[in-house]
């Protein structure tokens, strides 16, 4: 597309949005979303979509609310004052029960990597459902072995032995057992701000306040300082493996990083004071997801892994959110840190929303587990899950989604970084590939989190304009952006304009 045509197209979108004061949502994908309570300049034309959803003919909205209140656990909370009742999905689009269309920039919590209801994945699932759903792993079936061969080919030596399970929590739970069985030690370390699951075992690894219980959830899990170069005590303008750095000043030499060295000293302090002289392991997300897309200084994980191994521990990379090409430059997040874990856990994007997860390790660690217990999962590695998993890997390769994550992700990061320059309440824009965090602050000097009520309103405004993003951070102060990996630059442009309008609207409210 030529520059002149792009300019003409942008002018057309602007002219269209100014002419349309209010449009009722219809069931056609060509319709524009109705935007209540927002000023005219905040309305933006959605990118085109050639899919029309089915007419919603299920439960009335109020009936859904009543069922949710009476019969679903109160821990099942939803975004927004009026939660969305979603009806259908197509690639990067979601449709609610009223026919409104939304651009999904959170992918079901960083899960729907190849797009909602991708036709190839759907066709494979239907074909396998007609053939064989479930046997349990006490019988052989080709989908499991085909998938194991495909997945192992994407991992470096010696990470070649695969345990198939059903969720990220279950995968990390098993990884904890593996680490303790192999090392014959107990203590496991994880970062503050880490999220590794909500099972009774993994709750000890998870260090985000709202997920912690008032009673002991597990033993021998210790936290260490998260090397957060924006919110932490140290950080500069060259720390991150990202096209966008923090606004903090940096006096480091070109070949050094003072922030990294200081965070390593904190890690050593944890090893020297909070755990036994020999430990079982260390868990790390290559980029923290739930904590708001937090990146560490370059080389930190590499040095931390070496220190852990000196204590007899194994190193576990939690790739539940970062794996399968989402970060763009590499297929796995640990590869971006130039390091090699002993165990890798994965879920979410592995099945594009179908319940599936895996733990991958070395033959030596796998053998040690077999000597300690007979591990078994009734549903892990089912024919249906494995067929879907193979289809997801094929789509990622055939559609060059890792390359798209790199190209469009870099474009998105650089574009959203402009908001940090324009708005004082945007403290940081960070990330890699199609995993981006936008941290909201009261001001850039104090870096104090923007109050949750204000972040909520910005979130609501984005939704009202047809954009769905996630939330993260210990104070829910960070917007998490992780669209399906097939997202286009045109869709990024729309998301940027919506987000910018939501921020402008917020500043107007503040000024009143």
Curated annotation (Swiss-Prot):
Tissue specificity of this protein? Expressed in the liver, lung and kidney.
Catalytic activity, per the record?
Answer: glyoxylate + L-alanine = glycine + pyruvate; (R)-3-amino-2-methylpropanoate + pyruvate = 2-methyl-3-oxopropanoate + L-alanine; 3-oxopropanoate + L-alanine = beta-alanine + pyruvate; 2-oxobutanoate + L-alanine = (2S)-2-aminobutanoate + pyruvate
Cofactor requirements of the protein: pyridoxal 5'-phosphate
Residues annotated with N6-(pyridoxal phosphate)lysine modification: 348
- Enzyme superclass (EC): transferase
Cross-referenced Pfam families: Aminotran_3
pH effect on activity, per entry = Optimum pH is 9.5 for transamination between L-alanine and glyoxylate. Optimum pH is 10.0 for the transamination between dimethylarginines and pyruvate. Optimum pH is 10.5 for the transamination between L-ornithine and pyruvate.
A GO CC term assigned to this protein in UniProt: mitochondrion
Q: Which residues carry this modification: N6-succinyllysine?
A: 69, 260, 302, 415, 418
**Compartment(s):** Mitochondrion
What is the activity regulation comment for this entry?
Inhibited by 5-fluorouracil and 6-fluorouracil. Inhibited by phenylhydrazine, hydroxylamine, l-amino-L-proline, para-chloromercuribenzoate and HgCl2.
UniProt-listed Enzyme Commission number(s) = 2.6.1.44, 2.6.1.40, 2.6.1.18
Tell me the residues on which N6-acetyllysine occurs.
Answer: 55, 69, 82, 260, 415, 418, 452
PANTHER family, A to Z:
ALANINE--GLYOXYLATE AMINOTRANSFERASE 2, MITOCHONDRIAL, PTHR45688
How it assembles, according to the record, is: Homotetramer.
Q: What is the name of the protein in this document?
A: Alanine--glyoxylate aminotransferase 2, mitochondrial
Per the record, the gene is Agxt2
